[in-house]
A protein has these predicted regions:
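N-terminal binding-site loop/beta-alpha segment at the start of enzyme catalytic domains
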Residues: 1-68, 183
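Acidic-and-aromatic substrate-binding clefts and catalytic sites of carbohydrate-active enzymes
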Residues: 22-25, 45-53, 75-81, 106-111, ...
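Short, acidic/polar
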Residues: 22-34, 78-93, 139
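A structural motif
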Residues: 39, 95-98, 126, 150, ...
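A short, structured active-site edge motif that brings together acidic residues
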Residues: 65-78, 99-106, 133, 354
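CE4/NodB-like, metal-dependent polysaccharide N-deacetylase domain
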Residues: 83-103, 119-123
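Beta/alpha (TIM)-barrel catalytic core signal, keyed to glycine-rich beta->alpha loops juxtaposed to Asp/Glu
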Residues: 105-281
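A beta-strand edge to alpha-helix "cap/lid" segment located at domain peripheries
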Residues: 283-289, 293-315, 320-421
Length: 421
């Protein structure tokens, strides 16, 4: 990995993972896959609503925190309470510090927010400061008012829109450009340019890798987004070749003044400012969805057990058939003892209380107080139980049962009654 030394001597990986438009679950898996692939820079934002997901991916990766460069952004509707939102961001991500904190949009009281960021910087909560989507005039305004100058400006940047005038201005202050949309947005027009096909063939790379290499040689930081382990590996495989000066000049011919994919005006900024600054709302929704996902895995397990028992239970209609308890076959003479010992063949579950807990992002435990109803020898028995199920998250994000323990409780409440025939 190549590193960029910022104007405050902090070292930042030249390439990182962008998580724009990713759900908390997708951001978690993308972060995990990226760190396993060798990435050491992860970018998120308050306004992406996935910071907690990124944090889970970081924890699950096992990569030491000091080896990871985490950047995030404050949303403008929170600028007036920037100090509070800085602390909330740290708490949301479970971090002691943020490597790069960025003002996301050039609207609202960004000068007051910058002052709050400077105080957090001095307190060691932030290692570097940046601006996002700010035009040159507003960057100059921040620089003029700032005690701590920006280290980075993240803007739309790609061969169609290299932003060379802004680059020249920022170079006076040693400010690095970080490119979002480094591949020219979601369409394929940029990567289908013939020059990239030609250079890809020459270097044994893909057009995407050639474009990302162009950014590196321009001095840009880049944060392409991907959830695919294969694409992540490809995006990182750009540091073993270099484009010549003539090739860089040929790519420069693609630049078209005004060819951008993103524009914003005051009406857009007004919408940004109207967005509520409750950035935990999607995480709360994700936790609800995660709980439902784990319970669905549990229901599949219980259903499989019930299907097995009910199928086997049908055999008890034949007096010569063996007695079956939870998939275990016993001789017919054991039936009365099974009833006496309050063993059951479950046919119905009635949950009284269910608690789902996720531990260390990869282990889920379901604590369940329930009643199990059995039909034994034509009779119905109802037993109260406490069950503990433990699930492990697999590489594909699914949950696998790894242990199941149930304990019979309150035997004085045991019910056994004859059914009418």
């Amino acid at each position: 990995m190549q590193y960029i030394t910022l104007n405050n001597d902090v070292k930042m990986p030249a390439e990182g993972l962008g998580t724009f438009l990713m759900s908390p679950a997708d951001a978690e898996m993308a972060t995990l896959n990226a760190l396993r692939a060798g990435f050491r820079h992860i970018d998120t934002a308050n306004g992406y609503y996935n910071e907690a997901g990124v944090a889970r991916g970081i924890r699950r990766s096992g990569v030491p925190r000091e080896q990871i460069f985490v950047s995030t952004k404050l949303w403008p509707s929170g600028y007036t309470r920037a100090a509070e939102h800085i602390d909330k961001t740290l708490a949301r991500m479970g971090l002691d510090y943020i490597d790069m904190l960025i003002l996301h949009q050039p609207c609202g009281d960004y000068l007051a927010a910058w002052k709050a960021m400077e105080e957090a910087y001095k307190a060691g909560k932030i290692r570097a400061l940046g601006l996002s989507n700010f035009p040159e005039a507003k960057i100059a305004e921040v620089i003029e008012a700032a005690e701590v100058k920006p280290q980075l400006v993240t803007v739309e940047n790609h061969p169609y829109h290299p932003n060379d005038a802004l680059r020249e201005y920022l170079s006076k202050y040693g400010i690095v450009i970080e490119a979002w949309y480094p591949l020219g947005h979601g369409d394929a027009s940029l990567r289908n340019e013939p020059v990239f096909a030609k250079l890809a063939e020459k270097y044994g790379k893909s057009p995407v890798q050639v474009i990302l290499r162009w950014h590196i040689q321009k001095g840009n930081s880049i944060i392409p987004g991907s959830k695919s382990p294969a694409h992540l590996a490809d995006n990182l495989d750009i540091f073993d070749f270099a484009l010549t000066d003539d090739e860089m000049a040929e790519i420069a011919k693609l630049a078209e003044p005004g060819k951008t994919y993103y524009t914003a005006d005051e009406s857009v900024y007004e919408k940004y400012l109207s967005i509520p600054d409750d950035f935990d709302v999607q995480e709360a929704k994700y936790q609800e969805e995660l709980r439902a996902e784990i319970l669905a895995a549990s229901d599949e397990y219980w259903k499989a057990q019930f299907d097995l028992d009910v199928d086997q239970l049908r055999k008890t209609t034949d007096p010569k058939a063996p007695f079956v308890h939870m998939g275990i076959t016993m001789d017919r003479g054991a039936e009365e003892e099974a009833i006496a010992q309050r063993h059951i063949v479950t046919v119905k579950r009635d949950d009284k209380h269910v608690d789902v807990r996720v531990i260390d992002d990869e282990i889920a435990i379901i604590l369940r107080q329930l009643e199990l109803t059995a039909l034994v020898g034509g009779n119905e028995a109802i037993n109260p139980f406490v069950a503990t199920e433990t699930y492990h998250r697999q590489a594909d994000g699914s949950w696998k049962l790894i242990s199941f323990v149930y304990t019979h409780i309150m035997p004085e409440h045991y019910q056994f009654r004859f059914l009418s025939k």
